[in-house]
Amino acid sequence: GIMNCDKNDMIQEFEEKPAHPKSNLASMGIYIFNTDSLLEYLEKLENSDLDFGKHVIPSMIQEDRKVYVHTYDSYWKDVGTYDSYLEANLDLIKKSEEVGINLYDQGWKIYTRTG
């Protein structure tokens, strides 16, 4: 989702996959919730698909709940497709020294999973 925030990082608008984005602040899909608030929304929206970007977050914002962002300014790559997964791996190879990763360190483990 794409969002707009105020000066205190409180989300004012959240739109999932907009045709014409109003900002370049994108959700990484990682959320932290107060348990009671989340359970309340899951119960309220139980007959929907319960997609966080389409239902839960926009509903909370619409009801003036306090929803904030944490701006992450390092490398992040959506790896939801084979092409983007390949691109992320190529980025790792190209930028390993830049980010302080030694790919030739025998003690550094790389974990991956398919399916």
Language-model segments: residues:
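Conserved core of the sugar-phosphate nucleotidyltransferase
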Residues: G1-D36, E43-L45
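Left-handed beta-helix
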Residues: D36-S37, E43-G115
